[in-house]
Amino acid sequence: MQEKNVFNWLHKDLLDIDQLSQTDIFNILNTASSLDETNSRVIKKLPTLRGKNIILFFAEPSTRTKVSFEIAGKRLSADTIGVNASSSSIQKGESLKDTALTLQAMSPDVIVLRHSSSGAALFLADLLECSVINAGDGWHAHPTQALLDVFSLWKVWGNHFHGKEVLIVGDTAHSRVCRSNVTLLNLMGVKVRLCSPRTLLPSGVEHWPVEIYTDLHQAICGVDAVICLRVQLERHKKSFFPSIEEYAKRFCLTPKHLMSAKTEAKVLHPGPFLRGVDLASSLIETPQSLIFDQVSAGIAIRMAILFLFLTCNDL
């Protein structure tokens, strides 16, 4: 690995993509690429973060993000400690602020936060001395997911992002993944399209740097990749469509839809995915699918982020 500070990494926290420069993005991608090969070793361990403590504070359910952060930390020899809201003092009425200050008193180097409230990561970052990494806050942002999505495409496209077209289809209104991906893909020179029912388009989307569609057959024409999103029923406070079956008839990605995309178009999904609602089961394990590649990419990207924050930070 590179010597300390070679990246001139100047960030205390990772809250969203818009704080990163294009140089930062490529530092993350190149570091992830270097670390990715360790995942195929018999012994998947590096001593890089020995002696560092990482707290995974997850106040929302998670499989992929939590486990991949834990594996990422352990593969770099850090000590990772998991805290769930359901088993923390939050259940006894303790505030997020007091819980965070309690954790800080234990001298962690990084707190990785997943929370249902938009802005929770910024709140902790302003409060705490240690680094805070946003692992998803409400509808707001999920920067490491966007980075691993781009890393998955980078392994296929190389540096040839400029002029590519990517469609994001599904519940874009309630998706933090959508928001972070729109920012990152635009930074990479990609033209982004969104496709949702009108009731599931984000507020103010007309001001986003995207093309907006409500017809999947039209939206998918000629695209280089499709990112499918789950319908987030747990975030819906009212009905946005007649039924899940009616939604699937119009917005479930099928092989027929994909025939209108570029021949080598890739299919992605941040997970968890709903077969037959977000996309057809037959697409999940095809050569065009990067869905399980994204899971592997998540480990490498999160290793890279932990490495940069804990060994290359000049602050």
Swiss-Prot record:
Q: Which InterPro entries match?
A: Asp/Orn_carbamoyltranf_P-bd (IPR006132), Asp/Orn_carbamoylTrfase (IPR006130), Asp/Orn_carbamoylTrfase_sf (IPR036901), Asp_carbamoyltransf (IPR002082), Asp_carbamoyltransf_Asp/Orn-bd (IPR006131)
Which Gene Ontology MF annotations are present?
amino acid binding; aspartate carbamoyltransferase activity
Q: Which reaction does it catalyse?
A: carbamoyl phosphate + L-aspartate = N-carbamoyl-L-aspartate + phosphate + H(+)
A single GO BP term for this record reads:
'de novo' UMP biosynthetic process
- Top enzyme category: transferase
Keyword list (alphabetical) reads: Pyrimidine biosynthesis, Transferase
* Residues involved in L-aspartate binding: K92, R176, R230
E.C. no? 2.1.3.2
* Protein residues bound to carbamoyl phosphate: R64, T65, R114, H142, Q145, G271, P272
Q: What's a GO cellular component annotated to this UniProt protein? A: cytosol
Q: From the UniProt record, give the pathway where this protein acts.
A: Pyrimidine metabolism; UMP biosynthesis via de novo pathway; (S)-dihydroorotate from bicarbonate: step 2/3
Family assignment from sequence similarity: Belongs to the aspartate/ornithine carbamoyltransferase superfamily. ATCase family.
What is annotated about its quaternary structure and interactions? Answer: Heterododecamer (2C3:3R2) of six catalytic PyrB chains organized as two trimers (C3), and six regulatory PyrI chains organized as three dimers (R2).
Task of the protein: Catalyzes the condensation of carbamoyl phosphate and aspartate to form carbamoyl aspartate and inorganic phosphate, the committed step in the de novo pyrimidine nucleotide biosynthesis pathway.
Report what the protein is called. Answer: Aspartate carbamoyltransferase catalytic subunit
